[in-house]
Design a protein with these regions (language model features):
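Alpha-helical interface subdomain recognition
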Residues: 1-78
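Generic structural "secondary-structure junction" signal
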Residues: 39, 92-93, 130
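Short, solvent-exposed polar/charged micro-motifs at secondary-structure junctions
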Residues: 46, 71, 100-101, 135-138
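Internal helix-loop-helix
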Residues: 53-111, 115, 119
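Glycine-rich, Trp-frequent "lid" loop and neighboring beta-strands that shape
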Residues: 109-139
Length: 139
């Protein structure tokens, strides 16, 4: 999804514009590869990177990486999950990893590294969700 392909009255600056762009990726390029994801183990790197470039996987992060809008991040994941649950889960993994990076206080994980992750230029996840939830006493 190229942001220039959006209708002129829809911009990525508005939550509705972002969700419209996410929906277009989900129902277009992602829908085209769902069978390959489910049956052949295709990793939707290009589709995830499109979603990241739109801001769909960083909406929950604080500025300058995101909008500090957890609700918008969840709605974006829901739009994708309606088409492909596996890709929706990968969005969650990317989002949580970004949140951990931002909250780490580690300069090496913020700045350029966080911005690359937030934009989808780099993809990642966390293998330590359960220990981190326990440590933060949210489980």
């Amino acid at each position: 999804m190229n942001p220039n392909d959006l209708p002129r009255d829809v911009t990525l600056e508005s939550p509705d514009g972002l969700l419209a762009a996410v929906r277009a990726v989900a129902r277009g390029p992602l829908a085209d590869v769902v069978e390959a994801i489910d049956r052949q183990g295709y990793y939707p790197r290009a589709e995830l990177q499109q979603l990241g470039a739109l801001g769909a996987m960083s909406a929950h992060l604080d500025a300058p990486a995101g909008r500090s809008d957890f609700g918008l991040a969840i709605r974006a994941m829901a739009e994708v999950s309606q088409v492909c649950g596996a890709t929706g889960f990968m969005m969650w993994c990317q989002a949580v990893c970004g949140l951990y990076m931002q909250a780490s206080g580690n300069p090496a994980l913020n700045g350029e590294a966080l911005m690359a992750h937030a934009s989808g230029a780099t993809l990642g996840g966390t293998a330590m969700s359960n220990p981190m939830k326990s440590y933060a006493q949210i489980e």
